[in-house]
């Protein structure tokens, strides 16, 4: 058990604040809650496993590579790349501020579980059209993350992760599998070009307590760890982090509803095989 007795009461958001932010997806607000939990001196001391590299560090690494002309050609395109990249997602962007209007539309599409890009509310971005199938089942993709974790077809990954945490809050089996062994074939079916980037998410609950109003109260802090083979640090990260924060909040809300114990998310932790930006976004490193 992590002893957070000395943490000031106001470091922990009220559950009403927390609950209201789930559907709002206002990352400035969301990350303020996360900051109270993850970057407080007391929390870092209590949880020594927190990553020390954050989004500013990743930006500085990319900037140094850009200044040194350390450019790689990946699939015919000039890129700046950081391989085997591990960092704390303490901000909702790394290189360029997010398009919140689109991020909300993509979140709605994920929640619909549709595997067709034309079902994205509003207009369908060019990048989704380019990777979707071009014959037979036209417009189909693999990477609807809502389908990946909420659908029966992919094994109800979210429910199994939540059930594992409820059954044993110290479990190491609370995992959501996004990818599948057939992806090498599925990614190019019917002219598609969609080899899913995320392959799994693992969740841990850290049991904590604090003293408030002369009583000891037990609660949990969720560690939500993402594993990806590849991530575009502009189009990918900016939208992915909104999605993962939504899922982390939903996990905490559902865990609390089922157990009666309050749970709060900390920052998302990212592990990426290839974290990169393309040449069209190099200009954002000149600021």
Where are these regions (language model features)?
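Terminal, non-catalytic protein-protein interaction segments that mediate quaternary/complex assembly
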Residues: 2-287
